[in-house]
From Swiss-Prot:
Keywords: Cytoplasm, NADP, Oxidoreductase, Queuosine biosynthesis. Pathway: tRNA modification; tRNA-queuosine biosynthesis. It comes from the Bacteria. This is NADPH-dependent 7-cyano-7-deazaguanine reductase. Gene3D superfamilies: 3.30.1130.10. The active site is at residues 47, 54. Catalyzes the NADPH-dependent reduction of 7-cyano-7-deazaguanine (preQ0) to 7-aminomethyl-7-deazaguanine (preQ1).
Amino acid sequence: MVQSSEKIEVKYGEREIAEGTLITFPNPRPGRNYDIQITLPEYTCKCPFSGYPDFATIYLSYVPDQKVMELKAIKLYINSYRDRYISHEEAINQILDDLVAACEPLQMKVKGDFHPRGNVHTVVEVMYKKE
């Protein structure tokens, strides 16, 4: 076995993803119900059974209450799934849980439209509504 003395450099994007946190800012129009729709077409994770990569488009729709999600923070959060071994179902449920905890919306829907693999196309959709 050959050992390398080369230092492995962490790329700035990897560092931003690792250090990323979900950031919010005050809703500029509290009291008005309006829908924010975000599409994230480059979601990736790894199958917890095979280790093969899974790809999806994530659709996020929410009605904010007092806080709005910062878009770059959402992007970095979604990119953090890249090397995680996680099922489609758990991933979409976890995304919903984390985003709801961060911004406490009036309602939110997260849909994961996964690319077909092995002739199977999966869409997972979860919803939250404040009581």
